């Protein structure tokens, strides 16, 4: 057996019906498009969301919300990520050096997710209440 001799099992691949090839094919003449109308024409059909001229749903409903541009430069730091930083002092630069946050991040907040076992000094980051308690319980400090 070679790769060039492989073929699917007999009868496993059925050829698709060809349109416009006689009345006996079941898809002759109009080819399954019906008679006349926009959808029977070549290039016919309507865009997504078009409702025949009626005001479409996406325009009937009101606009809402926005995307804060600050969210693109803000990151959440898990407690478990603090152990990945070398030296025991955690700030924006050491987090970037450890590839925990991207270089475009300007603000970060430490949240209570995971565990911290080694004492660390958190400098210049915002810290949630639960994360603050966990860091101090592990013997760490928080410097504003």
Swiss-Prot record:
Q: What residue spans carry the Gly residues bias annotation?
A: 21-31
Keywords, sorted A to Z:
Ribonucleoprotein, Ribosomal protein, RNA-binding, rRNA-binding
Q: Which domain of life is it from?
A: Bacteria
Q: Does the keyword Ribonucleoprotein apply?
A: yes
A GO cellular-component term linked to this record: cytosolic large ribosomal subunit
For molecular function, the Gene Ontology terms on record are: rRNA binding; structural constituent of ribosome
Family label? Belongs to the universal ribosomal protein uL15 family.
Q: What is known about its subunit structure?
A: Part of the 50S ribosomal subunit.
This one is known as: Large ribosomal subunit protein uL15
